[in-house]
Amino acid sequence: MLLSAPVNSTVRRKPHSPNKKKPKETGTAASFSSSSSTVVLSSNNDGSFDALWDPSISKASDFESSYISAKRLKPESSNRQKKKNSYKYSREENTNEVEEKTSLGSSSKTEADNIFNDQLTSAGNTTYVSNKRDVNFGANSAVVLLGLPTSKSESHRQYHSPSASTTNEDEEDIGVDILVDNHIDSCETVSINNNRGITHQYPETESDVDFDEAVILTPMDGTDKGVKNPRPLEKKYSSSCFEDRTPLNLDDGHFSECNHFSTLDVSSFFHLNEHVHKIDEVELDGPDRTFSLDNVAINTRKKDIDCLYNSSREDLSNLTCSSEGPRNDSYDSDYNIDEVTYRDDESTDEDESLPTPDRKRKKIGHKACEILDSKRIGIKVPKLYVWSLSDKPFSVIDGLCTKSLYPLSDDINTPESLSSCSSSVSSRENQKGDATFDNDAMIADLLNIGGLEVEKASNGHIELIGE
């Protein structure tokens, strides 16, 4: 931001930037402190300077001194290498206007450039943005560069203008953050004393994935100084851990982080998963969780096969009762089969008169064969004979009813049955007494039984209608 002064003051600088990238818009302040006067400069990216003068030099007393103190950097440090960076300022002051021009001799300019180039080559083959200022204030005043900006946000410089002509001051050796053309958002820090750089990767935001890549400490020269057993890939539990981590330690040249955040290696994830799977397999292989058919004994020779169902049902009930408790009482009750008791000598459809199966006979019905034709096989057609009707009222032979052959016994005779077959019985008794029993005639009579009954029923119905 340009600040207008009541006096006419113009300061120009010569831009010197090897890297063509434009950094973020920042201001550069330079203060000249001496026993008599103090000058503070503020610069922008467009190359122009804004001068804040002390009231003893000019009448610009309305500028606040708080703005100057807020832009100061750390004070001058001791025990540093002495660098010769001297600039000559010529100052011309008139009564009506103050005009400042920047001038620097060709010999002194080349010497300053050589000093900066030597410092950069000693630090390593890295991209460096120099912020040299060539300022001419006149009046034979000298300004010495005190320090470099410590970060991208703090890009202000402090200059000292003593009352003497030229003095040599210690330059503060601080790592400078430099933007590097890379596919990730990273920053290279150059340390002039240690002659090696440290790659620092900026953390991602909290909206990113939970597991982010931690800081990879890899010196630019390939050595392993200051880091013990670095891991190529490390994961952290939360991306917010970077907020509490300390920044680069510029004095030691390595990155220090707090110990209360634990890191987990990628390989440990696989080991953890393997242990979890092993625990699950051990639990499933336990005797309480397995259900096999080893406890079920199958014997095909036994008559009662309910033992198979009973044993499996008992195992199932024991497993369910031990695991779930009293909630499965109704579930187990569904499988309980109640014995059926019959009353009043009731019987089932099972034929109890059949003989028990012989255990010695392996194949049942191995002699059975299909009857295709009676003439071909040699089986005679069954004949009709007189059957005793003591146990059953009638019998079925070849699909024909034999109840009309002989009269029923006295204990089961009914008037309805007698009336229905009286005519047929009388005719057959006469035939039986007159001649011998004829099979062909009997078969013919049996085949015509249904037709005679239908004719009799129809004739009786017609007679009733005629009456």
Curated annotation (Swiss-Prot):
One of its GO terms (cellular component) is chromatin. GO terms for biological process: negative regulation of ribosomal protein gene transcription by RNA polymerase II; regulation of transcription by RNA polymerase II. Residues 1-10 have a biased composition (Polar residues). Residues 1-42, 62-110, 151-170, 341-361 are annotated as: Disordered. Residues 89-102 have a biased composition (Basic and acidic residues). It is found in: Cytoplasm; Nucleus. Its main location: cytoplasm. It comes from the Eukaryota. Residues 28-42 have a biased composition (Low complexity). Phosphorylated by CDC28 and YAK1. Keywords: Cytoplasm, Nucleus, Phosphoprotein, Repressor, Transcription, Transcription regulation. Disulfide bonds: none annotated. PANTHER family: PROTEIN IFH1-RELATED (PTHR28057:SF1). This is Transcription factor CRF1. The gene is CRF1.
